[in-house]
Amino acid sequence: MAAAVAAAAAAAAAAASFQVLEMESMETAVAGSASLAAEVRGSGTVDFVTGAGISTLVDTGGSDPGPEAEDFECSTHCSELSWRQNEQRRQGLFCDITLCFGGAGGREFRAHRSVLAAATEYFTPLLSGQFSESRSGRVEMRKWSSEPGPEPDTVEAVIEYMYTGRIRVSTGSVHEVLELADRFLLIRLKEFCGEFLKKKLHLSNCVAIHSLAHMYTLSQLALKAADMIRRNFYKVIQDEEFYTLPFHLIRDWLSDLEITVDSEEVLFETVLKWVQRNAEERERYFEELFKLLRLSQMKPTYLTRHVKPERLVANNEVCVKLVAEAVERHALRAENIQSGTLQQPTSQVSLLPRYGQNMDVIMVIGGVSEGGDYLSECVGYFVDEDRWVNLPHIHNHLDGHAVAITESYVYVAGSMEPGFAKTVERYNPNLNTWEHVCSLMTRKHSFGLTEVKGKLYSIGGHGNFSPGFKDVTVYNPELDKWHNLESAPKILRDVKALAIEDRFVYIAARTPVDRDTEDGLKAVITCYDTETRQWQDVESLPLIDNYCFFQMSVVNSNFYQTASCCPKSYSLENEEAVRKIAGQVSDEILESLPPEVLSIEGAAICYYRDDVFIIGGWKNSDDIDKQYRKEAYRYCAERKRWMLLPPMPQPRCRATACHVRIPYRYLHGTQRYPMPQNLMWQKDRIRQMQEIHRHALNMRRVPSSQIEC
């Protein structure tokens, strides 16, 4: 009994002791809270404090009580959560669904159905219980664009994107990422792939990207790729990938009026090549594609010698009939021309060239007209239609400038007008526009400009206050920069150039007999090796074709020395070119040329195939009544005689001319182009100065006339 009482007393004492300790603990906590509240009150902020299982909102002080509740958001929580979930997926923790990619090496990818269903609407119905995939926990992924299916690394990256929202896309993986994004309805990832491909769009991949854009309905990407293909169609059809396109895309391109092509003959050969790549499957499409060709734009000889005998044409009644109609149309046109009957312009679109068809044009650039006015207007002789057309203005006053033709541009540089003597512009035929590029390093005119291996070489020239230049400079279009090379051994003025083997530059020029004066100029012909940078005088230009023969037959005349000549490039080897150098040159090419033409100065000379053109110039250079010319002459190699062409819209001298191929869209109808703003302002300024000068002269004449009276 005593023991029981003692035990009860001990228990009561222990309970009392615990209550005391609990009260002390509470007091300590309250005291701590009061102390912390005092500190907070001093700082003027609000904190949410958690202590010993009791949450207390602490007053911030001041007259207005703080809010009773506030929201808390951890900015990194979502990203950390998605990262942890992805780590769990990679370790196979808590996964409840398996994605089976039969093509990806037979690999299976474990995942969480809740994450996949939240990431994309593709998985929401699939895993909601209505389909067998939800019950079995396996989703079979089949039917991919390629037989093996997407690479395992790409699949892993896209699944990781659904967890984390991050992915790295490369040019090698973008097509598979795009296919997976399209399959899984990952809209933002699909749009990103479209923007990525836009940045990587290039002539070498535009066909493939255009196909991808169509396949996955990326409309903006498809438009941009189509525009690149359309403007470079004549290059695109040289790529083997073009001939892997399906019928409907080939049909769409042949139906396009804007595709840039060199001729309908090329399109006919393109259709044949596409069909022959898989004749068994594609021959049934030939008739439909053949109907899209503009046979009336093909030469009659080509129709009869190449198109008509072709097996696919000869065995098809519809195709045979179309060829016969085109040949008959050509015969009727020739009969009208021979009889002098004016042919009414056709309104039938199928009989006209495609708007994107490249047409042969002799382009005339810059120069001076009557009254000494500089001409910024460019004009072109449209060879097929035997008429002159207007082309865009240049932004400079060009006189004594040089011209050079590259694969994509026409470059003009230099001028006698000091304000434009260093300026370089280039013309883009596909866009029908001029643009400025890096200026020359020296103000000059009457120099040589020619292309070698994609770079422009500027050689020699003449300055307004210099007897001439020996300098050689090179322009790199990729860097848009000029740099100096070693100078020529002598001054070279009035330079005409030919390029051989994409290395050697043959030059006909004049050099001063006395370097200290401009009097006494002698003709010189020399060869420059652009690789060794060595110079060697030669007896003549290589007599390769009519253009070379013509230049050498007039090389010592004032007509040639004051003319501008478009440079020409030849692919033959230099050894063969050297064998064509000769001391004696036949002047047979001049026999049918009117004698008065060779008395012209400041003419523009250029070539088209094996024909030669002489355009503009002036007569009576020493007389007050200088006669500016607008006549143009053409040496027809086929007929071996000179012909007088329709006159230019206005006379001009010291212009340059060159052959260029321009899309028909810029040539049909009557084109009008505005004068550039910088030249408009300068023209107004000159007019004002002339009026001031005229007024000053009138003021001086008044007293003089009064005295005479």
From Swiss-Prot:
SMART domains: BACK, BTB, Kelch
Matching Pfam families: BACK, BTB, Kelch_1
Top-level taxon of the source organism: Eukaryota
InterPro entries linked: BACK (IPR011705), BTB/POZ_dom (IPR000210), Kelch-typ_b-propeller (IPR015915), Kelch_1 (IPR006652), SKP1/BTB/POZ_sf (IPR011333)
Domain BACK per the UniProt entry, residue ranges: 206-308
Modified residues (Phosphoserine): S466
Protein name, per record: Kelch-like protein 11
